[in-house]
A protein has these predicted regions:
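Glycine- and Gly-Pro-enriched alpha-helical subdomains that act as flexible
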Residues: 184-185, 192-214, 219
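Conserved alpha/beta cores of soluble small-molecule-handling proteins
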Residues: 1-185, 189-190, 218, 228-303
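Secondary-structure junction motif
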Residues: 222-223
Length: 303
């Protein structure tokens, strides 16, 4: 069987050969900016937006891009096309980009050349396994607030998407002690809700969608799609500080994220949200997303 390709530092290579040296700053320091895009009908969805956000993250992290935005879009499109040819047409791909800040000469035990010192850039794909999200799409996520708090934007700006996620690992470990199938929803130091592990968190109340402010959440590409669809459906979208009080008293809640688009949340810390079932506003948004994607996003995952 032909092996999928990866892009690493200017070359398309077999994915099994895509390796980083142990002295790469992505490994030593966790100094890595990243993005994830997915396909619909094996075509990348909102690729340009993901690449644009990655370059904003690189700029803020003081990591010099080694290609232009346009070049990375072209590289990514070619990579997806190469690897999609190896799969059945009904299989979708996740596309990962990451760029590290380069190498640590001390750990390399030698002087690094100018070429070796450049930031690492990698892109790779994988078949999306929707079974991870199927039960949540049918019945809704259980979100749990662990003791770990969201990193304040004064320390790391939440608008930057990065790989230093030890706090999420610890948070998820705590959450899974409560419910192995739950996902973490972090509070900030003031007790405001922020975001989930890998997803934005949204509420529906009195006919409007309510979101935490952009002060301490990632401005998700999928969240942007929800805003667009809400505008199209004449649903008000409001940003404000929200607390657990607002979650338990919401009519509905949902998560937005690249792999699944929009997925209901029906429980928080063991309490039902609304009537404990996926709600009508989520359904309207999912139907509109399906129209945009050209396929039934709920059936693709839940069936």
């Amino acid at each position: 069987m032909q092996e999928p390709q990866a892009y690493l530092n200017g070359e398309f290579i077999p994915v099994s050969e895509a390796k980083l040296p142990i002295y790469d700053k992505g490994i030593v320091l966790g100094a890595t900016v990243t993005e994830m895009t997915r396909t619909y009908h094996q075509i990348p969805f909102r690729l340009e937006a993901h690449v644009r956000r990655m370059f904003c993250s690189l700029r803020h992290a003081s990591i010099e891009p080694v290609v232009s935005e346009e070049e990375l879009v072209e590289i990514s499109t070619e990579l997806v096309a190469k690897n999609a040819r190896l799969l059945p047409t009904d299989v979708e791909l996740g596309l990962i980009h990451f760029s590290t800040a380069g190498k640590v000469p001390l750990y390399a035990c030698r002087t690094l050349s100018e070429e070796e010192s450049k930031p690492t850039l990698c892109a790779h794909t994988f078949p999306l396994d929707f079974s991870y999200y199927a039960d949540a799409m049918r019945h809704g996520y259980h979100v749990v607030t662990p003791s770990i708090r969201h990193i304040p934007p004064q320390c790391l700006d939440s608008k930057m998407k990065y790989r230093s996620r030890l706090h999420w690992h610890i948070a998820d470990s705590q959450t899974q002690l409560v419910d192995p199938d739950a996902t973490s929803l972090l509070l900030d130091l003031q007790g405001n809700i922020t975001e989930c592990s890998g997803a934005n968190f949204l509420l529906a109340k009195d006919g409007a969608i309510h979101s935490p402010t952009l002060r301490n959440i990632l401005p998700g590409i999928s969240r942007d799609v929800v805003i667009e669809l809400a505008c199209k459906l004449s649903i008000p979208f409001k940003e404000q500080d929200l607390q657990l009080y607002d979650v338990v008293n919401a009519d509905e809640a949902f998560l937005s994220s690249t792999p699944f688009g929009i997925c209901p949340a029906t429980k928080v810390n063991g309490k039902l949200i609304g009537d404990g079932r996926p709600g009508s506003m989520w359904r309207r948004l999912a139907d509109a997303w399906s129209e945009l994607a050209g396929l039934d996003i709920v059936a693709q995952i839940a069936d």
